[in-house]
Structures are given as C-alpha cells and as structure tokens.
Amino acid sequence: MNEKQRLEQTGQIQTASHPADRKSDLERLKAKTTKDYEKYFTSVFLPPNLKEAKKRGKEEVQYVKDFTIPDEFRGMGRGRKFYIRTYGCQMNEHDTEVMAGIFMALGYEPTDRPEDANVILLNTCAIRENAENKVFGELGYLKPLKTTNPDLLLGVCGCMSQEEAVVNKILKQYQYVDLIFGTHNIHRLPYILHEAYMSKEMVVEVWSKEGDVVENLPKVRKGNIKAWVNIMYGCDKFCTYCIVPYTRGKERSRRPEDIIQEVRQLAAQGYKEITLLGQNVNAYGKDFNDIQYGLGDLMDELRKIDIARIRFTTSHPRDFDDRLIEVLAKRGNLVEHIHLPVQSGSTEILKMMGRKYTREEYLELVRKIKAAIPDVALTTDIIVGFPNETDEQFEETLSLYREVEFDSAYTFIYSPREGTPAAKMNDNVPMEVKKERLQRLNALVQEIAAKKMKQYEGQVVEVLVEGESKTNPDVLAGYTRKNKLVHFVGPKSLIGQLVNVRITQAKTWTLTGELANEAIEVN
C-alpha cells in the first residue's frame, strides 16, 4: 500500500469498492473476537492482512522526496515527553531513530523513564515467538502507568503490528493500548498521534502491501561515530519459515543519489563508520526499471567517499553476485567482514526452507569470496530443529560449519511463525532434540571462534574506539574492521578515533591489547 492507496481505503479518495472492502476488513477481524470492539476503532482503522501482505502486485511504489510536518501539527509535543523501547534487528533500531526524529520535530522531548513519558511506543520484532512474548509482558508491566496517567498514549509499532493474530490479541487482551501502526507508515506518525489525541479511541493503521520510499525523514542518531543508512526496504524471498516478507513488504530500493548524498553528509559530520541496511540488502536495485544498478555499483561509488568504514547487512546468498565480490575486493573503506546466512548445511532442508540454493552452491560462493578476499571474516545464521530435520541432516550443518570456518554465528531453535508455510508443517523434532542440537552447534561455534581469535595475538589491528568498556570504565572498547571487540587502556580523548592496538590476549569473543605506534597497511 502506498499513500494513494491509503487515501482510497480510508475514504479521502472515494472509490467504488471502498465501503465494502473496509467493512469486510472490520468484520473479518471482529469475527475472531468474542466481544464487539468496534467502539475502539476510528476512521483510520486499517487492520493487517497476511494474505494481502504476500501479494507482490504491480502497484507503483511512490517516492516522496521531502518529508514535511504540516503546520497544524507543529508544537503538538510541547511540554510532552516520549519513550521508545526497541526490540529486534538493526532495521528496527534505525526506525526508532526516525520516529525519535519525528517526535522531536513535533516538539516532544525524549526521556529514558517510561513513567515520565506522555507517549510510549514499543517498536517490536516478529522474527521469533520469544521476542513477541517479551512485548506482551512489557505491555502488562506498563498497564499501571495508564491508570496513574490517563492521558498517556501507549502504542505498539514495528513488525508485530503487521500480524493479524497480534493485533487481534491486543484488541482482546490489551484494550488500554491507544495506537497500533506498522512498518510501512512510520512517516504518518504525526497524523496517527493527532487521531489518537482527538478520538481518545484505539487507532489502528497498518498497511499490508507496498509502502512508500520517503526521503529526508528526520533522525536522532545514537552517538556520532557509527550510523545506519537504509538503502532498501522489504523482502521478496518468502523463505518458508520467515515472517519478514509479510511484515516488511515488497522489496523497494532508495535511489542511489539519495543514498550517496546521505553518506556524504554523514562523512562531513565526522562519522567514521556506516552500515548499509536492508532485509535483503544485496537485492538492492533489482526493482529499478530505468537503470541497471546493484549493490556492487553502489558500493563502488561509496568507497570513493572519505569515510573510514562501510559495512552492509543482511545479505542473501542468492543475490551475492560476482560484481559485488569484485568491488569488495578493492577494499579501502569496504571492510573485509561479510554476514552470509546459510540457515542449514543440508540441501534437503534448504529446499524445505525455500532458500533456493543448495549446500554446494553456498560453498561455491564461499570459495569465490575467499579467493577474492583471502582474509575475509564470514559470519552466518543457522536454524536447528526445522520440521523433519534428521540427525544426518543436522550433521551436514556441522560439517558445513567446519568446512567454512565461520568467525561466529547467530544460532536459533526453529520457531514457527503463524501465517508462514513452515508453520503448517508437522513440527516433528522433539524439543529436547532441538536443544541438544543447539548445544552441539554452539560448542562448535565457540571452538572455531576461539581458534580464529587466537590468531590475533601479537598482531596490530585498527580499532574504532566507541567508548568505555561496559564492565570497566577505565578500559576503552572498540571494534576492528572485521567486527572483533577489542579492550585496551587509553585516554578518553581517543573515543571516536581510529587507533592501532597490539593484541596481547585473545578470548573466545573479545581481544585485549595495548596502544601501538605501528602503522597498519590497508590494501
């Protein structure tokens, strides 16, 4: 859904099909409830619809070049404070930066204490059931604040809001929630807040299909050393276990000139590192109709900008092409760290997951990358206990991990997500077996990580100093180009700077060192 479609559906642009469509949406959700919740709905009621979310139609994605806040909303937040709690991935972190920017443009002030806030938003993650349970627990914890402060607005946004079952559960069990909006319409936050203030009823506005690409959104970035830069939105891969294509919509890329301008501005402001973000970041540009331009082309232009480091996440093996490998091999400010989720080492399981590559194709891609960038640090994601996974298929995952020798991995027990094809499969792997497999995998991950880290002892590495250690304020902490955490003693004036550190001790997940005078040759 884009802005034109939203106006049609809410009645601001009249269409012949609108009244029936809107009534059917309302009746569809109400049919799943035991009470009449229509009194909680407002004129902007747009429920999530997973069936609609799966469609990848030809509706044109609108590019809005300049975000603006209408004059009537300016000052809305004067004398009010906002609090946002963020769950999940870097995309959610970036979305929170945007929402904070909008709040402050409206006149709100930030607070770190939910009890002091006039608006509380939970920016949610839907990737696993555990993440959702945390949000529902937090909603229960926040309920007393609504009693003590009736004017408080409590909202749920992010990926969970795109799920029908979640919205239905909130309508049934958390009726004190004031607003629900999704991932595609963050730029409409001023309108949603206004509606919530004016109606004093629950406001639900979730777009289930295409979103817009909106430029020049205000942002409040955390710190001034590293920055996220969104280069695309959505995912069209539809892996059978994954809810993201439903919650984040179709793939849609920002124009390269807008991205390049943003990175140049960040470099001019003194940022040292940027991370390019996308649910499937190396599908960037595949939706362009007027130019042939991919992530490799974008990286080739960004590497010419005077900024120390450029990363990207998360990539999909299917879209990792030779052009991207060729550009990454030029190095410079393009770091030699690639996150490349494999999910399983079994071709049969990969097929059931809908990953569209085989074990052999993944290993061939790894060989290409290592041939071009011999010292590359590869990290990955792996799911254990997928429906029908046998002991032999799990052993294939272990053997692939040993062959690639990843630097680290995010490992998970399979978590069924309602509305995905895998959720309909017979989940026939007992939980005790899943846990045992996860333990074995994690033991291997730690074994190889320790081996990889040991190689750093005696080496001099470049460290971007981010601040004090979380455990010792007298120790500084920062990250290498390969994303290794380094601790060392030094003056606080080094925070935000690139320094050389000689590694004296390696642990499984951290390195310890001392300031070094030696220069590092960067190819």
Curated annotation (Swiss-Prot):
Keyword tRNA processing: yes
First-tier enzyme category under EC: transferase
Binding site for [4Fe-4S] cluster 1: 89, 125, 159
Classification of source organism: Bacteria, Bacillati, Bacillota, Bacilli, Bacillales
Protein name per Swiss-Prot or TrEMBL: tRNA-2-methylthio-N(6)-dimethylallyladenosine synthase
Ranges of Polar residues composition bias in the record: 8-17
Xref: PROSITE patterns: MTTASE_N (PS51449), MTTASE_RADICAL (PS01278), RADICAL_SAM (PS51918), TRAM (PS50926)
Presence of keyword Membrane: no
NCBIfam families membership: miaB-methiolase (TIGR01574), MiaB/RimO family radical SAM methylthiotransferase (TIGR00089)
One CC-aspect GO term: cytosol
Origin species: Geobacillus thermodenitrificans (strain NG80-2)
EC number: 2.8.4.3
Entry note: cofactor: Binds 2 [4Fe-4S] clusters. One cluster is coordinated with 3 cysteines and an exchangeable S-adenosyl-L-methionine.
Major site of localization recorded for this protein: cytoplasm
Known partners and oligomeric status: Monomer.
Catalytically driven reaction(s): N(6)-dimethylallyladenosine(37) in tRNA + (sulfur carrier)-SH + AH2 + 2 S-adenosyl-L-methionine = 2-methylsulfanyl-N(6)-dimethylallyladenosine(37) in tRNA + (sulfur carrier)-H + 5'-deoxyadenosine + L-methionine + A + S-adenosyl-L-homocysteine + 2 H(+)
Transmembrane segments: none
Compartment list: Cytoplasm
Domain TRAM: 454-517
Residues annotated to bind [4Fe-4S] cluster 2: 235, 239, 242
